[in-house]
Amino acid sequence: MCDMLDNKLGNRLRVDFSNISKQIEIPNLLQLQKKSFDYFLNLDNGESGIEKVFKSIFPIHDPQNRLSLEYVSSEIGKPKYTIRECMERGLTYSVNLKMKIRLTLHEKDEKTGEKVGVKDIKEQEIYIREIPLMTDRVSFIINGVERVVVNQLHRSPGVIFKEEESSTVANKLVYTAQIIPDRGSWLYFEYDAKDVLYVRINKRRKVPVTMLFRALGYKKQDIIKLFYPIQTIHVKKDKFLTEFNPNDFMDRIEYDIKDEKGKIVHQAGKRLTKKKAEQLIKDGLKWIEYPVEILLNRYLANPIIDKESGEVLFDSLTLLDESKLAKIKEQKSFDIANDLANGVDAAIINSFAQDGETLKLLKQSENIDDENDLAAIRIYKVMRPGEPVVKDAAKAFVNDLFFNPERYDLTKVGRMKMNHKLGLEVPEYVTVLTNEDIIKTAKYLIKVKNGKGHIDDRDHLGNRRIRSIGELLANELHLGLAKMQKAIRDKFTSLNADLDKVMPYDLINPKMITTTIIEFFTGGQLSQFMDQTNPLSEVTHKRRLSALGEGGLVKERAGFEVRDVHATHYGRICPVETPEGQNIGLINTLSTYAKVNELGFVEAPYRKVVNGKVTNEVVYLTATQEEGLFIAPASTKVDAKGNIVEEFVEARQDGETILARREEVQLIDLCSGMVVGVAASLIPFLEHDDANRALMGSNMQRQAVPLLTASAPIVGTGMEQIIARDAWEAVKAKRGGVVEKVDNKSIFILGEDDKGPFIDHYTMEKNLRTNQNTNYIQHPIVKKGDIVKAGQIIADGPSMDQGELAIGKNALIAFMPWNGYNYEDAIVVSERIIREDTFTSVHIYEKEIEARELKDGIEEITKDIPNVKEEDVAHLDESGIAKIGTHIKPGMILVGKVSPKGEVKPTPEERLLRAIFGEKAGHVVNKSLYATASLEGVVVDVKIFTKKGYEKDDRAIKSYDKEKMALEKEHHDRLLMMDREEMLRVCALLSKAPLNSDQKIGDKNYKKGQTADISELEKINRFTLTTLIKAYSKEIQKEYDDLKNHFQNEKKKLKAEHDEKLEILEKDDILPSGVIKLVKVYIATKRKLKVGDKMAGRHGNKGIVSTIVPEVDMPYLPNGKSVDIALNPLGVPSRMNIGQILESHLGLIGLRLGDQIQEIFDRRQKDFLKELRAKMLEICSIPRLASEKEFIKSLSDEELLNYARDWSKGVKFATPVFEGVNIEEFSKLFEMAKIDMDGKTELYDGRTGEKIAERVHVGCMYMLKLHHLVDEKVHARSTGPYSLVTQQPVGGKALFGGQRFGEMEVWALEAYGAAHTLREMLTIKSDDVEGRFSAYKALTKGENVPATGIPETFFVLTNELKSLALDVEIFDKDEDNE
């Protein structure tokens, strides 16, 4: 813990119970997205993602080779507006991309058509507008809305071998291989039921694999030699002999091995061992007899040619039978394909048999003899059926499919995976397929089929990689450019003779690129509305990994295996945090310490172990790199020198847990918490919770609403400050220095670097609305004079307390039933919590209204609204907008607006009368913005945007003046501070140097050689200084000039900053066409805890507030303190989240120890500081490492007091996940806090004052209020809108709909026999149009409700039947039924 405090990230001390001291800091939680986007935009000065994409598309040539378009360079502009401006004005925070394009016109030789030289070169800069820019908080502002692009977890390109059960043949396994590129055609190799090897391209019809090899230019013999060992058979004295090669006989042999004399040297059915084989060779065995029965059914590897006539007797791949063998005996020797060798089968031979027929037919139809050309034509016909084909086009097509970098891209990752799997040595820059890749893949598949190869696991993290924002954007850019490339090629073909006049701009349409990118950000599945409920939800949203999205899985078709936790997730992907529901397992989160390497594979950190000794060297490994290694868990016992204590260690190897000798262990986990993600590592005692409940706990922490006053948990895990460190909500000091001035809105820090003094200014944001309508507010946590280090948190954001995440409140809880009110997880709450605003939160809602230009005139924002009472507009200002501070109730006018009525042209007389009497009211309609039914609160801000060319109203002018004044004041403050600092430095400089002449300074006279008093120097003004400085030496004068110049430069910088801010303020508002004014009103609503609100702990223990009980009626402790919350004890055993019990024990200990520290404060004896320090040291000495002891000893008295004051409200603990407090430590703590060992206490009933029969578990638990607020859900309707077709009330709160009375509810009333109620439900309360109208009329007049009519549903049914051409007539029962 101590090492964390040295960084001064937080300003709080926690008693840390870690077993292992931290080796490395937790890496920045958002670094993956930052690095990825920086790479894309070339901010790291390497070859960027943008450059790569442009170079992959350009140059573009026209078909006649007369013109070529080349990419020269690109330059990135600066954003036009700030982030805040973009959010307020509804714009996209983006930059323009300037692309330099060169168009070259070539000279051509008229006769040959060859390029001779360059005729003309034109260069032009082309602007690509609006490339969204990542904000410093790792999000994007698109149309004023903050969005996040989540990382995609997809299948890595490369080759993968699979084994699946056959869908057609029972109990048969089918083996397949796939070559997956990042871009281009997929290649599938598969066996069929008859053991023929086929290939498919892009899931088209399959062709025998040999067809593909032939299309690649291989001859029959070449293919046989590539796939089969060639065995030469010699003919001697009517015997077939072959060389003895032990490798061919390693398995059990089905025939006797005889030497050339016919003597049996090894019997059939016995295994030939290596030793025996060596002995046979030693004994001089060279030739053995090849049995004729085996030779039958073998195939020739090479054609057999008659030596005399030169005629081909038998072609290669001829199946040998007795008659053929008889003819072959005349030859001295011949070659056969040994398909009985180890690791091969007859698949290729079978494929040849299959493709022979096809080629014969093609030969006849195409009149081509070359088999390679025919194979290319066959593949072309499969890929493009029905199209005419020429052999050259077919060959070019096959070549384009896999060997053209424009069409096919394996990427660096794919090439690495291919090389690794197939043992190739192709250079990594070759990202297209090679012939060797295809051949080796087929060979390896045959090996796999014959039990020699290794089948891949597609869920292994070595076969899945992460595509982060940079790569996703590069892919989108490539798509846009590819569209543009096609358009340019089309334009090239339509160009006429005057090529000299063509400019790059005529050919390139940058809109194609922009639309593709903006489409990705607005409509892509991976670009999501940022979850901004609290800092944790924001951080975890940016660390999310999704298997969905373009090029990923489809959630309806994803099976169980993909969703399951895999052994390789250990330390890489959190096994706990994933949504409940249909996305479970498809959306994951990175583990806390995980990193992603440049190839997109997730790495986990380990410490190296050498000869049983743990070193301090930390290595990051991918799932592939850690294969086969023995890894010990972090909880392994290690002595002080780092040696592993026990001889046998429980270690992991390839996902299996085994006992390994300590010398065999190569790695050890960095720490126990590396397994889980950020949200799960915030749950104390996670190791005691059931995984399902932990999942709910981590998901619900993300829904916790920021409360009015944040307070950090008493029982934390130490992760709270890490999240605050990396969340942008907190303000962090860019550079170190001293706090010069602090107020509610700004912090000024004065510091000094190599160049000299500087002043940094930080502003606090107040009352901003987040995406989830929660309130975003910052407040300083430093005081004037504090020394601040770079990176230190100087202001808390929402849900933060002293630089720590604080998403809930510590509450005193009792596990006990309370009159049945906490039945089924309901929660009983004390009124004190509501009175003290413990769980009160502020929510901000934005309402906007536009004034448009219509054909009848312009709409006007005004207070002058027709047919509205004076008191209804009393709260509006002169401009017709609600004043700031107005209390808004449902139905009140927020902004007054009138719209012109379309009317007949008035006569001249009417116009004159109107001009005299100003009779305007009758010709406008009230179109004001009203507060909705559930909206109640206070107006906190108003933003007005006016289109250029239209007059600004008073309110807009006032707000502009106010903002300008604030900027001026801030600038003035900074200049004053600079001046003061400059004078201090100058006075300090002059007070140390002797005078060169007699001088009068202030009221004193000084002789030459004396030094002036600093107090006198401070009294004189600047003008006197300029003359006084001449009385000093040249060195001093130079130092003075340097100082003066430095401060002048700093002031110039401040002026430039100020001018830039003013310029932004004065920019014209950009509004959509037709809109002349836009008004946004922000209303803050205070939401107190109510019955129906959802609350939860951190262990998945959630519930609804069922009742709020007066404080006096709640159960109370012997000391008179009443309990805050009563929870149902039955919610614990079946849920198995015991962590909450331990948390409440430790929380109570924290409170009791805090009381003891408070007592020391209250006594205030002579040496109470000594007593305080002793008490704090006693508490800190309980954990195993006791790392805070040294820290407390080193604190000054003032610092100690600060920490002690914080502890007096409850001693704060950090119990990291999987390293929690153990039994011995708990018993020491119970003893110190003077609590019974069972953690239970006597309680008294608040209403009767009687002692409750059993002792009750009382503790302190951290409770959260979730954003499922009852105020936003309660809704009622009497009459309202109806659905057009069915005439039934619409559904949902948003549409002001009714409650659905469905099928099952109807059954309930039928079963109950409530006929009249049922009739009412199905008619006048639903879709009996006339009936409901007459019922309403009758009720308003106080008459009886008339009889009901026919529901509209009946007419819908009859009309449906009529639409099917059925004549439907309705007869009344009174009519005679003829």
From Swiss-Prot:
Pfam family, one: RNA_pol_Rpb2_7
A Gene Ontology term for the protein's cellular component: DNA-directed RNA polymerase complex
GO molecular function terms listed in the Swiss-Prot or TrEMBL record: DNA binding; DNA-directed RNA polymerase activity; ribonucleoside binding
The enzyme's E.C. designation: 2.7.7.6
InterPro entries referenced in this protein's UniProt entry, alphabetically: DNA-dir_RNA_pol_bsu_ext_1_sf, DNA-dir_RNA_pol_bsu_external_1, DNA-dir_RNA_pol_su2, DNA-dir_RNAP_su2_dom, DNA-dir_RNAP_su2_hyb_sf, RNA_pol_bsu_bac, RNA_pol_bsu_CS, RNA_pol_bsu_protrusion
BP GO terms, sorted: DNA-templated transcription
Record keywords, A-Z: DNA-directed RNA polymerase, Nucleotidyltransferase, Transcription, Transferase
Reaction(s) this enzyme catalyzes, per UniProt: RNA(n) + a ribonucleoside 5'-triphosphate = RNA(n+1) + diphosphate
CDD domains with a match to the protein in the record: RNA_pol_B_RPB2
Disulfide feature: none
Domain of life of the source: Bacteria
Record function comment: DNA-dependent RNA polymerase catalyzes the transcription of DNA into RNA using the four ribonucleoside triphosphates as substrates.
Assembly description: The RNAP catalytic core consists of 2 alpha, 1 beta, 1 beta' and 1 omega subunit. When a sigma factor is associated with the core the holoenzyme is formed, which can initiate transcription.
NCBIfam families: PRK00405.1, rpoB
Family (UniProt): Belongs to the RNA polymerase beta chain family.
The protein's name in its UniProt record: DNA-directed RNA polymerase subunit beta
Lineage, uppermost ranks: Bacteria, Pseudomonadati, Campylobacterota, Epsilonproteobacteria, Campylobacterales
Primary gene name: rpoB
